[in-house]
Amino acid sequence: MSAESASQIPKGQVDLLDFIDWSGVECLNQSSSHSLPNALKQGYREDEGLNLESDADEQLLIYIPFNQVIKLHSFAIKGPEEEGPKTVKFFSNKEHMCFSNVNDFPPSDTAELTEENLKGKPVVLKYVKFQNVRSLTIFIEANQSGSEVTKVQKIALYGSTVETTDMKGLKKIEDH
């Protein structure tokens, strides 16, 4: 981790990248040649030549499950000045969302990204709304200029894990 990226992580929080369940990650309306791993996966998201791009219009709907319960504190999204995300809505523990029903649910939080945010400045979320997060849905509703394509260079999620017991690791005690 570079000194620059370490300084971006809010004090007392960690990058939640290692806690993402990659087998369940989905992104609706992504370009097939500019997909979500470009903005989310380690190594890819640090390469400014790679990005996630929307396909049919400016909206993106991203579903991120975690392999353990987390507390989400803040996020950082990097993107270009014109096509970078502007209105971003976050939904905690809402599965099976799609563009036809995303407006049926109130978001856990909404952020309006500024030019400074698009350079990687973290945005603090309503922490009380993200205490027991098993999955996160991110709805990028609009971009900075209203253009047809939204581009995201990096998505980073910051928070902490919740101490829980791994129920899969427990063994049944047999009666004798």
Curated annotation (Swiss-Prot):
Belongs to the PITHD1 family. Residues 5-176 form the PITH domain. Coiled coil: none annotated. GO terms for cellular component: cytosol. Gene3D superfamilies: PITH domain. The modification N-acetylserine is found at S2. It comes from the Eukaryota. The lineage of its organism: Eukaryota, Viridiplantae, Streptophyta, Embryophyta, Tracheophyta. This is PITH domain-containing protein At3g04780. Keywords: Acetylation. InterPro entries: Galactose-bd-like_sf, PITH1-like, PITH_dom, PITH_dom_sf.
